[in-house]
Amino acid sequence: MHSEDIPEFMIRAGLTDENSISLSPAVSFRALLNVRMRQKQLTGTLPEWRLDNKPVAYSFIEQLGLRKPWTSSETYKLAELPEKENIVIKPADGAGSRGVYLVYGFNDIVDMKRSKNVGSWEQLKDSMEQDLETGWVQHDEWSVEELILENDNTPASDIKFYCFYGKVGLILEIVRVPERKYCWWTVTGERVRTGKYDEELFKGKGVTQDEIDLANDISLKIPAPFVRIDFLRSGDRLVFGEFTPKPGNYDEFDDATDQWMGDCFTEAQGRLTNDLLLGKQFEAYNQLMKTLNY
């Protein structure tokens, strides 16, 4: 039964009966995020979406005193791309791993989306040209940033925290070489299945409580019920990657996970509303928005 199909008398019973039935079927992460997207359509923007921009996100993270990769201050056409080692090449306006390349050396380059090695700089440019021709990358505008390594020859794994205003709900750990694998974690350190990537799971390394606390603290500084905070794991600490207000394929979680994350979202909305009513100012966020004239 979908949430909109639950009759009012059942909702009423859930609120009034001494042995009230659970109303958990009434919530859905998928549905709540859909509503959030409709809010964005109607209002033009939302607080978390203002951070869905690398320069803005990096400025926010710098305000908080956290580490981020070095990033070029300009974008490049493919023909103008500087030949450098130990860099990441990304589409300037892209998301996900399409068009992303890890350049360890001029003859040691990894195509992140295809999970394969590109043999030379010339082959790299051919592959990028193909990305443009097929529409994988929309515009011939590329950015360059520091290559973060987990150790001397292993690219950083991705650590993605699904944050619900001050509380991490789920954690996704991803390794991308030699092939892409995924591991879902709860905040209590249990590996779980969520319905996403069930055929591509591995036993990850997990995260520390300090790392969970870091994600919790950042999300408390953003006036939004949900945002995913993505990091790269370097040798000694997490390095900020990006804010993701709308995770890809968020409709693929199984029903149990979708319902549970719906509860997380709904509780977060309540906590955020209470904090706003109590006058919370979100100083770092508002200061940045004022600086940027948003």
Predicted features by range, described:
Residues G135-E141, W184-L238:
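A long amphipathic alpha-helix within ATP-dependent nucleotide-binding catalytic cores
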Residues Y58, A79-L81, A95-V100, I109-K113, ...:
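Short catalytic/ligand-binding loop motif for oxyanion handling, primarily in non-cytosolic enzymes
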Residues H2-E8, R12-T16, S24-A31, G206, ...:
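C-terminal active-site "lid" helix and adjoining low-complexity regulatory extension at the edge
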Residues S115-Y197, L238:
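Phosphate-binding site of ATP-dependent enzymes
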Residues L32-L102, N117-D131:
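A conserved helix-loop-beta module that forms one wall/lid of the active-site cleft
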Residues P155, K160-R176, V207, E211, ...:
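Catalytic cores of PAPS-dependent sulfotransferases
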Residues Y101-F106, F164:
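Short beta-strand-to-turn element immediately C-terminal to the catalytic PLP-Schiff-base lysine
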Residues H2-S3, L42, K68-T75, K84, ...:
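Catalytic phosphate/metal-binding cores of nucleic-acid and nucleotide-processing enzymes, i.e., regions
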